[in-house]
Amino acid sequence: MSASISSLIKHPLVFRGRDHRHSNDGGEVRLPFGQANLDKACAGGVPAAGAMSIRALAGQGELQLLNNVLLQKAATQKRIIWLPNQLYLNPNWMSQTPYQQQSWVVSTSNEADAQWACEQAIRSQACCCVVMYLAQIAPKAARRLQVLARQYDCLVVLVHPGYRSPGALPVNIDMELSFDTQQWFVHLHRVSGAWPQQHITIEHPLPAANSAIVNAFRQYSSSSATAIHEVS
């Protein structure tokens, strides 16, 4: 009897209420970042439902790190909500993404309104993902968004500097993006289904040092290369 019930529950047409997403084998669905070292450390990627925290400065490459995850969420054809919270979200970058048509940018005047808008987007069940920029996030607020996002099958990404959050936040993944003179790293302060790790090397679109700028100046420093820029 128990085997029959288990088989029935796993049927894709059976609604399982507030249960978060599972794969066909009963495991939790995880979305890979497309970074081999990071995906291995995160037990395959970020859980498809729930909240994750990225401790990074805006424009540090956090969106490129998320790109593969957002592409997978966009396959649901639901909305992706962006809450830049008074930060400038480059429309040129947005127009070049495959999920541009699904993306809505919501402007708010303060962080309290941004968090309220985030909760409403989750509850609407019309959104597959919410990306919210904050100056800081309290553990209690992060926990609230984690519970709501798992309940309504939504991925919430919290991007914040992290200076005022010394401990790990109660979310699926709490990661920090950092670099030294030669390499970019991710530090995992918390990860569901695996252990925290430090100094996970990743491929990053931004150079960790200014060597790329130096090489560019050196390349175009000759008179033949700069002739087209000369005026008389």
Specify the residue positions occupied by each region the protein language model found.
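Detector for small/aliphatic-rich hydrophobic stretches
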Residues: 1-82, 86, 96-100, 193-196, ...
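Conserved RecA-like P-loop NTPase ATPase core
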Residues: 38, 54, 130, 149, ...
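Conserved beta-strand segments of the P-loop GTPase G domain that flank and frequently precede/overlap
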Residues: 53-55, 83, 105-108, 130-134, ...
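Conserved strand-to-helix beginnings and helix N-cap segments that scaffold or border functional pockets
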Residues: 63-67, 115, 142-143
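Conserved inter-motif catalytic segment of the P-loop NTP-binding fold
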Residues: 77-128, 137-140
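Short, hinge-like loop/turn segments at secondary-structure boundaries
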Residues: 98-100, 122, 148, 172-177
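A contiguous pocket-lining binding segment that forms or flanks enzyme active sites
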Residues: 126-166, 171, 179
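Phosphate-binding/switch region of NTP-binding enzymes
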Residues: 160-230
